[in-house]
Amino acid sequence: LDTNGNTVDIGVSDLYSTTCNTTTAIYQAGSSVSDYTGPVVPFALSVPAASTQVSISAEAAHAVFGLSGKSSTLGGTWKDATPWTDPTYYFIRNSSSGSTVLSAVMFNVPKTKFWGIDRLSTDNLRDSMLATTEAEASIGILSIVDADVNRGNLRSLYLQSPGQISGYLPDSNKNSFDKMNVRDGHYPLWGYEHFFTPIGAGGVPSDAAKAFVTRFTIARLDQHLLDNIIAASLVPQCAMKVTRSAADMGNFSTNKGLQCGCYFDEKTAGKTDCTPCGSSSDCPSDHSACNYGYCEIN
């Protein structure tokens, strides 16, 4: 912002305010600023395609990003987190970025204590990983937006979250784009896209802000917008089977809102087992809602 001041209609974040600042919120939600949640943004722990590594656990990620991957940092009680033992090849963002903050919560590492080099921007992080000459030693935390479009050169790791007995990709397999494990809660490294808007005395945002956030936060999204969200590797809330609050990354609730999982499957996998429909009269009683051309429960 310049010194003359600008009118800010919307701020965008991957985080709840209380996740970003766990001790005190900068504002009281609903008093001077409103938080509108949009689509889901998954993140991936990624390695160069030439790496032989395919998986990582949250505990191993703690050893890497919290302890530099070396047993000596732990007093010699664990084995080194080979091959990730040189923080020079940890590709991260700063302590206020969504990728770092969400990972810090899951890996139990203070967000200001991450080992690695801040690559200053998301684009720079991605490009630095693509250019690395040390494929086996390199690991980074990427938005799925960048991970998906670079699958030929970067590989997302199976992530075993705390309490799980196996690891999961964001998708059902390495070749798909269905975000199935994000949508059903098996892969919890994700955040909502948040739109923060100042609100006036009447408790409503400016006309400009309202015109924007309404498009993303109404239950039934415009189909053109829905298509663009899906094409960007994001997950619209209507395609999620689970929801969660700011309190706990793994504390999921069933999504009882309007559903578009059938349409999402058709767009990402080219097929769906759902019943097509032109109106609700075409749908059976147990899937009575006709949403985006398919019968859904809600």
Regions found by a protein language model. Give the residues of each.
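Flexible loop/hinge segments at secondary-structure junctions
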Residues: 1-298
